[in-house]
C-alpha cells in the first residue's frame, strides 16, 4: 500500500530591488498576466498574491514592490514597508538578482534577507543573455558568500528558463498543510484593482522618459451589462503639466492608453470591455496619507 501524496501549502515572498524582474517571474510561473510590468523602476506598488496550485502543492507567491532608498514621500515609505513586511511570516523567500549587476538597492534587500529564518532561493535572473555561462561563476561565488544558506538558481524570468527547477525547489520547502485557497483561484486582488493596474501599466509604458511617477488610477465604475463590461477609470496626477502629458496632442495619447488597456482587460476578464478614461489633478496625493488611504495604499 502506497502512502497518499503529502499536501503542501505556504507563502513565498518574491523580493528584490526595483525593476529586477519580480513581476515578470510571477506572471511566467502563473502562466498568465497578473502583475503589471514595465521597464520603469517602482512599477509594482502593492504586495499582490499570485496563487499556483499544481497537484498537492499550492504556492502562494507574494509579489512585492522593489525595496529602494527613497523615503521622501509617503508613497515611497508605504512601498518599502510593504516589501519589508512580506518577509515576515513567509515559508520561503525567492530573492531575485541580476546576473552581473549589483546595486546599493540590491544590498538593501540583502541586508533584510540575511535575517530571515525560512529557506531562501537566490534566483539569478537574465542568465540566458550570457553566451558563455562561465562568466556567471565569479558573481555566483560572490553571492554564495553573501548568503551561504541560500540555494542559487540561474533563471530567465522573461523566457521561462529553469523556472521548473525553481518551482520544484519552492514546493519541496513548503510545509505540510491543507491548501489555503480554492484550486482555481489565482490572486487575492479584486477585478477593479487589476483593471486599475492595467491602466497604470499602459501609462508607464507609453510615457517613457516623460513619465510622471506621481500618477495613480482609481476605478469609479466596474459593471457588467449583458455582454459588455463597463469600466470607468480616473487617472490622478499631481500637476496640470502631467495631465497634459497623459492626454497628449488632441487626446491621442490617452486614446492609445485606453486602447491598449482595453485589449488586456478583454483577455483578463473574458468579456467585451467599454473603457472610459478621465484625468484629474489632485495635488500632493503621493505624500498625503489620507489620500493614500482612500486610494487603497494604506490600511
UniProtKB/Swiss-Prot annotation:
Signal peptide: none
GO terms under biological process: ribosomal small subunit assembly
Topology in the lipid bilayer: Peripheral membrane protein
InterPro entries, sorted: G_ERA_dom, GTP-bd, GTPase_Era-like, KH_dom-like_a/b, KH_dom_type_2, KH_sf_prok-type, P-loop_NTPase, Small_GTP-bd
Entry protein name: GTPase Era
Chief location: cytoplasm
One Pfam family, short name: KH_2
Domain Era-type G: from-to ranges: 8-176
Function, in words: An essential GTPase that binds both GDP and GTP, with rapid nucleotide exchange. Plays a role in 16S rRNA processing and 30S ribosomal subunit biogenesis and possibly also in cell cycle regulation and energy metabolism.
Database matches in Gene3D superfamilies: 3.30.300.20, P-loop containing nucleotide triphosphate hydrolases
HAMAP family: GTPase_Era
Subcellular location, record wording: Cytoplasm; Cell inner membrane
GO cellular component assignments: cytosol; plasma membrane
Keyword terms, alphabetized: Cell inner membrane, Cell membrane, Cytoplasm, GTP-binding, Membrane, Nucleotide-binding, Ribosome biogenesis, RNA-binding, rRNA-binding
G4: annotated segments: 125-128
Family membership noted in the UniProt record: Belongs to the TRAFAC class TrmE-Era-EngA-EngB-Septin-like GTPase superfamily. Era GTPase family.
Entry binding sites for GTP: 16-23, 63-67, 125-128
Gene name, Swiss-Prot/TrEMBL: era
Stretches for region G1: 16-23
Cystine crosslinks: none
Amino acid at each position: 500500500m502506497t502512502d497518499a501524496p503529502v499536501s503542501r501549502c505556504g507563502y513565498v515572498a518574491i523580493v528584490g530591488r526595483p525593476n529586477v524582474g519580480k513581476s515578470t517571474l510571477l506572471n511566467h510561473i502563473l502562466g498568465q498576466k497578473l502583475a503589471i510590468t514595465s521597464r520603469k523602476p517602482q512599477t509594482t506598488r502593492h504586495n499582490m498574491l499570485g496563487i499556483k496550485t499544481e497537484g498537492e502543492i499550492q504556492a502562494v507567491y507574494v509579489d512585492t514592490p522593489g525595496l529602494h532608498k527613497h523615503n521622501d514621500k509617503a508613497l515611497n515609505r508605504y512601498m518599502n514597508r510593504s516589501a519589508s513586511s512580506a518577509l515576515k511570516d513567509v515559508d520561503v523567500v525567492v530573492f531575485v538578482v541580476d546576473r552581473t549587476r549589483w546595486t546599493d538597492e540590491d544590498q538593501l534587500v540583502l541586508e533584510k534577507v540575511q535575517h530571515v529564518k525560512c529557506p531562501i532561493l537566490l534566483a539569478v535572473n537574465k542568465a540566458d543573455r550570457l553566451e558563455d555561462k562561465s562568466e556567471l561563476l565569479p558573481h555566483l561565488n560572490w553571492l554564495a558568500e553573501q548568503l551561504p544558506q541560500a540555494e542559487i538558481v540561474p533563471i530567465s524570468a522573461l523566457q521561462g528558463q529553469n523556472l521548473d527547477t525553481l518551482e520544484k525547489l519552492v514546493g519541496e520547502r513548503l510545509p505540510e498543510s491543507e491548501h489555503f485557497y480554492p484550486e482555481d483561484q489565482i490572486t487575492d486582488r479584486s477585478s477593479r484593482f487589476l483593471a486599475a493596474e492595467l491602466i497604470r501599466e499602459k501609462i508607464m509604458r507609453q510615457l517613457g522618459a516623460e513619465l510622471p511617477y506621481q500618477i495613480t488610477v482609481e476605478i469609479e465604475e466596474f459593471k457588467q451589462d449583458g455582454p459588455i463590461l463597463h469600466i470607468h477609470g480616473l487617472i490622478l496626477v499631481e500637476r496640470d503639466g502631467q495631465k497634459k502629458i497623459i492626454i497628449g496632442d488632441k487626446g491621442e495619447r490617452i486614446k492609445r492608453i485606453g486602447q491598449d488597456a482595453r485589449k488586456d482587460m478583454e483577455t483578463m476578464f473574458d468579456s467585451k470591455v467599454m473603457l472610459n478614461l478621465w484625468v484629474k489633478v489632485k495635488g500632493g496625493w503621493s505624500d498625503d496619507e489620507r489620500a493614500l488611504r482612500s486610494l487603497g495604499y494604506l490600511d
